[in-house]
Structures are given as structure tokens and as C-alpha cells.
Amino acid sequence: MQNLRPRQKGFTLIELAIATAVLLFGVVAVMQLVPYAMKTNTANRYDTTSVVIAQRLLDELTAQPFNNLTVTDPICGVMSLGAGAAGIPTMSPTANYLTMFNGNATVDFTQAAVAGYNCNYTDPNSASGGVYQVRWGVVVTDSAAGKVVSKRFVVGVQRSAMQFRFPVNVETTVQR
């Protein structure tokens, strides 16, 4: 009678070591993505808050009558709505306060802030008490008779102390 040895079943130690190394490599690669995902999630949350602040302020600015020169806001205080000159579009507060970026009007945060056209907004929902700098510019177009025909509002919001993030800009035009 012939004594046959039963066939071996299962993994060898080398196969197990290779599988463990591949799995470990995959876990380490994925773990390196976690800090980046957390950073972009936080930045996106700040951008979303900036859009909400800008839209709230833009809604308030556009709801004002055309001839109003100021409006009082509970957060920003007295806000200027721009003043026009007969027959020509006038940019308020200054001609270089708004700049063109990729074909869109934006608030230039490299310029010094102008009183009446900026405020700081503290986020009440942020545990760290995030502060956002809010600025706006107004382009007023008057008729030859000196009557306001249209106002273009551009609102920019930027989180203070955030490096390498562009400010959020929203704009609208109100016409008679």
C-alpha cells in the first residue's frame, strides 16, 4: 500500500506577509488623504458662510429706495449706498475699489478699507468666533437730470486670517 500524503490547504507565511504589506501600504496611502480632506472641508465651510453673509447684505442693499444714500444695519452700522453724478456712472467709494477679475467685478481687498463701505462680521455659529471682513462697492448711474437710473452692488466677503483663499464676491444690478 502506498502512503499518500494529504494535500496542504491554506496560505503560506510568505503569501500572508505579502498580503499584509499590500494592505498596510493601502491604509497608509489613504490616511495621508485625511488631513487634506479635513482642510478642504473647513475651507468650504468658510466659503459657504461667506456666501451667506454676502447674500444677506446684498439683499438688504437692493431693498433700499433708489434715493437713499445710507442704510443702518444691526451688524455693519451705517452703510453707504453710493452717490451718483448727473449723466455718468460713478463708482463709490473710489474708482479703484472695484477691480475686474476674469471678466467679473470684484472688491479689491488689497486696497485700504473705506469707512461706510466695510464692516467686520463675527460668525455666531463658529466656536472659534470667526471674523469675516465685508466690503461693498456701488456703481451708480444717474440720468442727465440727476435722477438715479440704476445701482450695481458688488459685495465681497473674506474670512480674516485665512491665507491662500480668494474672497467671495456677489453682485446684482437694480434698475428703475
Segments the model singles out, each with a brief description of its role:
Residues 1-11:
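N-terminal leader/signal peptides at the extreme start of proteins
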Residues 9-21:
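N-terminal signal-anchor/signal peptide hydrophobic helix marking the start
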Residues 48-176:
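Low-complexity, Gly/Pro-rich coil/beta segments used as flexible assembly/activation regions
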Residues 18, 22-25, 53:
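Conserved acetyl-CoA pyrophosphate-binding loop and the N-cap/start of the following alpha-helix
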